[in-house]
């Protein structure tokens, strides 16, 4: 996007601050383990945790492994977070019974696809099904569409998950992330 702005004679937009804010909120919440499937929407947050010697970052082969890993972390006395994209939520549905039935906290931060401004029709079904699927499994869901509300939403979700031993997901909408543009992606 910065290159497109530059070619139109506009100043590039400043980097958003919410990824750094999420990092600090999660550190303050005692997060020591990060389970993730690589995702561009989480890239700055992932890099921050990878650079943190106090945090263990585990790259998963599939998202549901993170649910089990974080249940184990909790049983071992540590807090963790699962970072994933909405398209990976479908992979977690059966495994979500673990924290629900066993009354374990689970904090998930989900970057959304398939909503506002989406260009890829293949992302729409799971993007639209993410919230109802999570709620059907007993997960408390908070969606945020304003960058200024990201940190406080994640903070509230972390408190809710770890104080009540419930699974909680924060959905970061495409208004926060920025909708991808196929024409711009094709030029890169």
Segments predicted by a language model, with ranges:
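Thiamine diphosphate
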Residues: 2-188
